[in-house]
Amino acid sequence: MMMSNLPKDLVEEILSRVPFKYLRAIRSTCKNWYDLSKNRSFANKNIDKAAVSGEKEFLMITQFNVFWVGVNLHRSQNNSFDLSIQLKAKIVSRDKKDDLFQKSQVIHCNGVFLCVREKMLVVLNPYWGQTKRIMPRPPFGCFDRYALGYDKSSGSHKILRLFGVNQNNLNIYDLSSSSWMIPDGTLERDMEYMKQGVSLNGDTYWYAKDKESIDWYLLCFDFTRERFGTPLPLPFSNEGYTLHKGYKSLSALKEEKLAVLLWDTMVIWVTNKIEPDAVSWSIFLKLDMEPSIYCRYGNFFIDEEKKVAVVFEKDSSSWSWMYNPNYNKAYIAGENGYFKSVNLLKSPNTLQLGHLVCSYAL
């Protein structure tokens, strides 16, 4: 029987086993395979495959290259954990260099990446092999803030632009219609600070503070209703915290939950429920350490099943860390005080990591 005559489900299963880096070659082989590889059910098979393997996927940006990176945690016989990191595919290389990732703010949502350049936006979908350049509406501002999400009713991706002196003027770009629009809703707050947002279930959440409030909070933009939600409480007291004291990081978990890491106490909370206007939290992990670890630029992810968190960080033992674009340390923290520091330059099965944008999901 020829491959073209095989049942659709069987072809999906076969193609889902093809490594990501070979998919483009597969698509060019047969029109039916090309159409099938862009089918949502085929994408879901890849999502399920990654979930079963327990592998975490990231987009890694170095000076000249962009890679797909797979990160795996392995439990050893003595209940310790080992970290292995694998380069899965090269997305952009020196040979076909495009400077869209250089000096860019890179935002991720559901497998799509938004690269924010001066007076230029670039949307990249590595899975489909698509790139789209978008001109923002004037006036341009160096403090303009962007977010990427999608309409849950239509599935269409949208770009949110916050601009103006207080970053409370809004524009929305709809990728399905290739057009900018001014939404009915506004941000009725003069924002003092908004950390780069995290996409979760099509919406974007920021760690934020406005000029009138004393406390920091979570702020959500709902891309389906095209409006901001009410400020959501964080799971800890904000008293005495500044931008750098009590530094916090956000991370999405399987497009279902949001995790927040408070660096100075090394406590991780995970949402039990999260919506644009409601949130509840529970402690996932607390690490009692003296002295505490100072982390400033780290990415982190958690493995709920193994009850482990992995934090990627720059080595701050010398002043060179301020100018080093790479993550060269990893901290693995778990239950019962488990803690392990990994030097990514010296450990087997690891490598020095460039800028990690996000955990990837199709």
From Swiss-Prot:
Top-level taxon in the UniProt lineage: Eukaryota
Entry-linked Pfam families: F-box, FBA_1
KW Transmembrane helix (keyword) present: no
Kelch repeat intervals: 150-201, 293-341
Alphabetized UniProt keyword annotations: Kelch repeat, Repeat
Keyword Cell cycle annotated: no
Domain F-box: 1-50
SMART domains: FBOX (SM00256)
Protein's name according to its UniProt entry: Putative F-box/kelch-repeat protein At3g20710
